[in-house]
Structures are given as C-alpha cells and as structure tokens.
C-alpha cells in the first residue's frame, strides 16, 4: 500500500478514489447500455439494411458495439487502477477513456448526419428498389427485406400499393397475375397478391416510406443520444483520473 506525505493528502486521495470508483461503475453500466443498443439495432434492423443506399446506419451501430466492448474492458482496468493506485494503470485508463470518447462521439455524429439526410435517401432509393430490384435474380436479400418491411409495418409499396403497377416484378410472367407481392396481403397465402382490394392488402397513407422513415429516425436519435451522452459523461472521468494521477505523483514517496 502507498504512503502519503500528510494526512490531508491521504484524505484527498481517498476522496478522489471513491469519486472515480463511483464514476467507473456508472461508466461500466453505460458501456453495457451502448453495447446493448448497438447489438439491438443490428439484430432488429438488419432485415431493413438492404433497402438503404448508405451503410452509415449500420456503421454507427458497429461503432457503438466496438465502443461498448471497449468501455466494459476499460471499466475493469479502471477498478484495478483505482484499487492498486498504480500511476501507469491510471495513465492507460485515461488514454482509453479518451479513445472511447472520440469513438462514441464519431458514432453519435454519424447517426445525427444520417438522420438529416434520411428522408431524401429513402425517397430516392426505396422507389428504385421496389421498381427495379424486387424479385430479380441475385436480389434475394433485397426481396426478403422488402417482404419483411411490408409485413412488419403493415404497408404496401413505397408511397402506396400503386407503386407496384410499374415494377419489373409485376410485369414479369413469374408474378403469375399478381397486382402486388404477397407480402402486401393482410393474411399471406400463395398468390394472395392477385387481388389488390383494401380488404385483402394493406392500404396505408404514405406507404412504407413514411413508416420506415419514422422508425429509422427514432432509432438514429436513440443511437446518437446514447453515444454522445456516454461520451460527455467520460469528460468527468478523465478529469477525475487526471486529478488522482497528479495527487499520487506529487505525494508518493
């Protein structure tokens, strides 16, 4: 155990240790939250990623997962550095806090930037995906994503079911007389899309575009808020770490 020059220094260092220990606990919990949000985003939204032109949404989630894992590992290091009072461990802990701060800030900014251009991207890309790529050879993943999108959000077409009338899929022989894909149906059975009546298919104002846009916007805001929120919390941790490191450096003998 270390020895200090004065009782006052001893009390101050112990006080800083307790503050840093409390911070590190909440920091570790925050890391678990960041990791959970990142994994949940990818697992729950992975089915929709194929209909997005940009990879920014997925990139933000992967960055959050990386940051969450790094936070939890760093948290364990922090507990050790505080208990053992090792200046080298505290320096490493501070550097890792700084790296994580920058990583989470980047993830939060990416989510915010993508949120700003989400509407325009969806309008351009979703219409083209439905018209040109759905049901085509080599586009199995896109087809599955659109089917899941229409079933999950109970919608049909980008803006309305009429969007399907001029799609490549509906004009092909393989459509077997369907007016819309079967995934537009309220109860999905083979070739149910041959009857495009409101009692049979989803007729939603704004179509899938409006619902997907709102869905992604909500989760981008959540990702951004979690990333930036935990990053701001880390500023307190870096300040406390510097203070403790400085005290230990001054008063050890």
From Swiss-Prot:
Pfam families: Tetraspanin. The keyword Ligase does not apply. It is a multi-pass membrane protein. The chain crosses the membrane at residues 19-39, 63-83, 93-113, 220-240. Keywords: Glycoprotein, Membrane, Transmembrane, Transmembrane helix. The keyword Transmembrane applies. GO terms for cellular component: plasma membrane. Gene3D superfamilies: Tetraspanin. It comes from the Eukaryota. InterPro entries: Tetraspanin/Peripherin, Tetraspanin_animals, Tetraspanin_EC2_sf. Glycans are attached at residue 127. Its main location: membrane. It is found in: Membrane. Belongs to the tetraspanin (TM4SF) family. This is Tetraspanin-11. It comes from Homo sapiens.
């Amino acid at each position: 155990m270390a020895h200090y020059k004065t009782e006052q220094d001893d009390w101050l260092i112990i006080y800083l240790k307790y503050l840093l220990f409390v911070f590190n606990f909440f920091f570790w919990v925050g890391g678990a939250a960041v990791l959970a949000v990142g994994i949940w985003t990818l697992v729950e939204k992975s089915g929709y990623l194929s209909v997005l032109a940009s990879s920014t949404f997925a990139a933000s989630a992967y960055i959050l997962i990386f940051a969450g894992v790094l936070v939890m590992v760093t948290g364990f290091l922090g507990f050790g550095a505080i208990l053992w009072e090792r200046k080298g461990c505290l320096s490493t802990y501070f550097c890792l806090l700084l790296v994580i701060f920058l990583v989470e800030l980047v993830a939060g900014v990416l989510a915010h930037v993508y949120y700003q251009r989400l509407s325009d991207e969806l309008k351009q890309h979703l219409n083209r995906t439905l018209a040109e790529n759905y049901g085509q050879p080599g586009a199995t993943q896109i087809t599955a994503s659109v089917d899941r999108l229409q079933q999950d959000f109970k919608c049909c077409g980008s803006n309305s079911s009429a969007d399907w009338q001029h799609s490549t899929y509906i004009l092909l022989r393989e459509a077997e007389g369907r007016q819309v894909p079967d995934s537009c149906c309220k109860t999905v059975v083979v070739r149910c899309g041959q009857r495009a009546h409101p009692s049979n298919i989803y007729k939603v104002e704004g179509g899938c575009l409006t619902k997907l846009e709102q869905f992604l916007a909500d989760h981008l805001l959540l990702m951004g808020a979690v990333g930036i929120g935990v990053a701001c919390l880390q500023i307190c941790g870096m300040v406390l770490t510097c203070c403790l490191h400085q005290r230990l450096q001054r008063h050890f003998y």
